[in-house]
Design a protein with these regions (language model features):
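Extended, low-hydrophobicity, polar/charged segments
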Residues: 1-127
Length: 127
């Protein structure tokens, strides 16, 4: 997040980080896109998803999304990947998600990010 913010000359919070979690089984992955300064609140995650927050290993992230950690893209993901956007992003007009590699990003309005990510819904799972 810090390096991306420096490269783009924006505050770190505007970097939209995509976090990868285990879904209900081995064939499903949950992506949560948050503001760069946000942290997952385990209690809120458990309440919303009805399961414990379990982040994927770097190997499983690459297998599930096709991207390495640091470059996970919130859009154009394979079947079985469900994407949610955290409300921590909504304080910004535009944010910068990764585009599939650790050295790529695109500036998007939050409504564009929601649409392009085929997001299921806005959620509140961060501190």
């Amino acid at each position: 997040v810090e390096l991306a913010a420096q490269a783009l000359s924006v505050e770190p919070a505007r970097i939209a980080k995509t976090l990868s979690f285990q879904g209900e089984d081995e064939n499903h992955c949950i992506l949560i896109v948050t503001a760069g300064d946000a942290k997952i609140d385990n209690s809120k995650f458990r309440h919303f998803f009805k399961m414990k927050a379990r982040m994927l290993s770097p190997e499983k992230v690459a297998e599930s999304t096709g991207h390495a950690i640091g470059g996970v893209c919130p859009f154009a993901n394979p079947e079985g990947v469900r994407t949610y956007l955290d409300i921590s992003l909504q304080r910004f007009d535009t944010v910068f998600p990764a585009c599939g590699s650790s050295n790529s990003a695109i500036e998007l309005h939050c409504d564009e990010l929601f649409r392009y990510a085929l997001a299921i819904q806005w959620i509140d799972v961060c501190k």
